[in-house]
Amino acid sequence: MGEKVALQVWRGDAGQGRLTDYQVEANEGEVVLDLLHRLQATQAGDLAVRWNCKAGKCGSCSMEINGRPRLACMTRMSTFEPGEPITVTPLRTFPVIRDLVTDVSFNYAKARQIPSFTPDPSIGLGEFRMQQVDVQRSQEFRKCIECYLCQDVCHILRDQQKQDEFIGPRFMIFLANLDMHPLDTADRLRAIRDDFGSGYCNITKCCTDVCPEHINITDNGIIPLKERVVDRFYDPIARLLRGIGGGKKEPAPALDPDA
């Protein structure tokens, strides 16, 4: 038999809700998701929890545990002090559907706004060799499991509620991956500045801190994009050189997510 743990779980829907107290058994080696499953099985059969792989790879079980955005399947009970109460609440940035399940469809709409990868048609299959630095950079960005913890913790979305103006850190690294690809020909910098709100990010690195895949979102993704925007639109020397040499990429404005 394990020890009893004080578990506070947010119960409710979009209209109203509150924290409900439970005493749940916890065994050695378990994670918070194990306790939620035990709670469903023994005390709260109607508790709504989104989960899938229980291996930290699907991003489904995102929630806030003691106020910090985490994956429930990767948060071990051993990280808490003995007797410490555990509070589990839904992601605060997104609308609640029921209990711990939130509506993250905002992110899907944002993804549809991004112009897709546009390869150079003049380069045939197998004619270009990727450099290792480009491979490594892309591999880091592609580790994203779309848990949206970074979107949840971003204060531009969470506190200032700038969902219409700022695309969020998850999609800033998606844009960085496209913009830094050596074969991509689309010019998204104006859209990154005007439509996706790169200027709103003040690089507090809170998104990097909560990423379960340890992607260096701020330093390797957002800051390089912001630097490219500055070089393009605010550096007079770079502007002069571009005027002499001409642009290599075709402008790619943001897309209509409802189209």
Protein language model regions, located:
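Short strand-turn-strand beta-turns centered on an Asx-Gly dipeptide
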Residues: 10, 64-67
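A generic structural motif
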Residues: 76-77
